[in-house]
UniProtKB/Swiss-Prot annotation:
Disulfide bonds, paired cysteine numbers: none
Compositionally biased intervals (Polar residues): 115-127, 300-319
Basic motif: region residues: 200-219
Keyword field contains DNA repair: no
SUPFAM superfamilies given in the database record: Leucine zipper domain
Lineage: Eukaryota, Viridiplantae, Streptophyta, Embryophyta, Tracheophyta
Gene: CPRF2
Record's protein name: Light-inducible protein CPRF2
Pfam families from the UniProt entry: bZIP_1 (PF00170), bZIP_C (PF12498)
Source organism of this protein record: Petroselinum crispum (Parsley)
Amino acid sequence: MDRVFSVEDISDQFWSPPAREDSSKLVMNRSDSEWAFQSFLQQASALESSQPLPSDPVPVAGDVKNPVEIPANVPVDSEDYQAYLKSRLDLACAAVALTRASSLKPQDSAALLDNGSQASNTSQLVSQVPPKGSGHDLSKEEDKEALAATATPLLPALQKKSAIQVKSTTSGSSRDHSDDDDELEGETETTRNGDPSDAKRVRRMLSNRESARRSRRRKQAHMTELETQVSQLRVENSSLLKRLTDISQRYNDAAVDNRVLKADIETMRAKVKMAEETVKRVTGLNPMFQSMSSEISTIGMQSFSGSPSDTSADTTQDGSKQHFYQPAPTSHMPAQDQKIQNGLLQVPPVDNLQQHSASGPVEGNKMERTSSMQRVASLEHLQKRIRGGVSSCEAQVSGKQ
């Protein structure tokens, strides 16, 4: 608590002038505050003639409990005593400042200098009061009161700075925690009791902490969304892998069936070529066989039509045209014609082939149906070629007649 001295607080007596000391004694050789304050107390005790004052390395802050009566009617030089008090006060302020300078930040030291200036202003107020008494005891008590007035405004400021520094350290170590109500309450109390600069710094700290908390929440929400998308993509990937496995299995089965069908087609082609060669050997012997093959082709076409009327007409035909299938008498025919007739007996008629194919099992294999259709197609091709040869032979016979 700051103490302001007024004119009413000072008694109407003059102070005794202190003895002038050399300037070399006033210079502080060490930077340690304790030694400086000890020298100050020793110099103050040297002014006493009757009772010495023990040295105390700890600065005293507070009111004087045991006041000493001021002797009356002691002449004193007011200007010299004011200069002496001012020098003592500056020395005490410097000692306290050096003590706290090592543990404070630059902004804290600036605040300390402000408090020092306030203390100097207080000392100026004390020095402006005209002294009215003199005495060694009065000078000693006045020095103590001036030192108490100087230390009193300094100590609360230092306590505030240290409390704010401790709070900032605590808040910096607990940034990872999202909610810390106790610290917020402590910082609010510090803001109320501190100066405006500390309040601004605390508000800035709170805003930074709040922004960091919001950013952590946004990151957490973003990570949750990404994890959900990853799980969905994994499910879709597993379903696509199953479909791919199924499709690949079907493709392998289709490839095997394709190879089997190709082998069957090659086999049927070889059989068709062998049948064509056999037909060529038979049809190239005698033109008389071409006329008989024309009848066979007409019968075969009627049987291939598939209508019930055609098949019934084929069954009700007279036997006048069936002499192509019966062997002729061999008495008036040459040996070559007999060989041709014997060869015709070996060729199965188309009707028999159609009946054989129709009498087969209905529930046959797919490959057997394909082979039978290929045989029918090859026979139709042969019949077309035979009909072309028959027409040319008939033209030659009509020309000879």
